[in-house]
Amino acid sequence: MNFHIVKRENCPLWKKCCFYLGAVAIALLLGAALLSALGVDPVAYYTRMFTMGTIGNKIAYKVWINYLKDFVPLALTSVALSLAFKMRFWNIGGEGQFILGAIAAAFVAFKAGPVMPAAVTLLLMCAAAMVVAGLYGLFVAALKVKFGTNETLMTLMLNYIALYILIFISEDKGEWNFFLDPESLRPVFASFAEIVAFPSIPMAGKFSLNICVILTALVGVLVYIYLKFTKQGYEIAVVGDSAGTARYAGMKVNAIVLRTVFLSAALIGLAAAFKAGTAGILSTSITNDVGWTGIIVAWLSQLNTAVIFVVSALICVLHYGSTVAAATFSQVDSSFANMLQGVILFLVLAADFYTRFRVVMDKKGGNGNGNG
């Protein structure tokens, strides 16, 4: 009796949904088993986590405001990474690009904020962050097209260079370092929240919607249109399928790679500007690991721009909700969400395998055309 893996000719959408939802359900059941072993009621914990403690909470609006502060950079970074991934350029440098974008945005806030109108300063912050992060990504793309370097290793190493630049800024009390609070005896980042900040739009009750949420949604729509309905988006798809075919068709593959990677990194810089402009201060943990989590979100979404927003929202619920739940259930650490996220990723990848392939079992001497 032999087993064979056979590629599926097609898999109906309803069946794909069943596979993916089943994978998530199994992950939640495994999490429930662990919670039970710790003496925690899984239903109570999951209710607390997925509602983020908003039920019966008089300050629930603050929970949603803080939740959106986490959602915006993750969603935008994931969308940005998907651009490069569609072209099979493995941009693992989201963390480094985000850090340098945040530093550039803070630089503009400190230097231009006191002397320019807030709207102009915010635009300059976004532009500076996009240019600096974009050039950081473009550097790797240039090495790739010129010398054939491995972009995965290059972007990974550049993450650490950017991180140590930020750490150096956070620890050096030299007179040049305007990023630090001059009145503090120990190195502490200075706040620029009173100088400039992204405004919020009043909504129902005390809830206010930061303009960055609207801008992120707008960028998502523009990226979707760019990929689906423009010549440049078509070129990205062709290069992703086969660079050789793209060259045979007369496409300038190197230029497409450079342009797309710059755009991908620049959008990560924009996410950093939104984060810095909302927080009003730099920190060594300003990325909140969105560069790494964004890779997971992009792949779970199968590089679909619309699905990226949904998955980002769910991942943020896991992260933010687990922190809220940890305050109630002391037996469970807030890192439970990271474990659950890993299990979900593993099982969804397994489900994705079954949407693309099927396992057939042949009896000895069979012709290998059985159904599975």
Residue locations for each model-derived region?
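Cytosolic-side transmembrane-helix boundaries in multi-pass membrane proteins
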Residues: 1-24, 241, 248-255, 322-372
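Short, non-helical or kinked segments that cap or interrupt transmembrane helices
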Residues: 39-44, 85-102, 145-154, 235, ...
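Short loop segments and helix-boundary regions at transmembrane helix junctions
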Residues: 10-18, 85-93, 115-119, 123, ...
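Transmembrane helix-bundle core of multi-pass membrane transporters
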Residues: 159-229, 336, 363, 367
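Single transmembrane alpha-helix segments in multi-pass membrane proteins
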Residues: 33-36, 51-111, 126, 130-149, ...
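Transmembrane alpha-helical segments in multi-pass inner-membrane proteins
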Residues: 262-342
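Helix-loop-helix "hairpin" substructures at the membrane interface of multi-pass membrane proteins
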Residues: 205-281, 305-306
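N-terminal signal-anchor transmembrane alpha helix
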Residues: 14-41
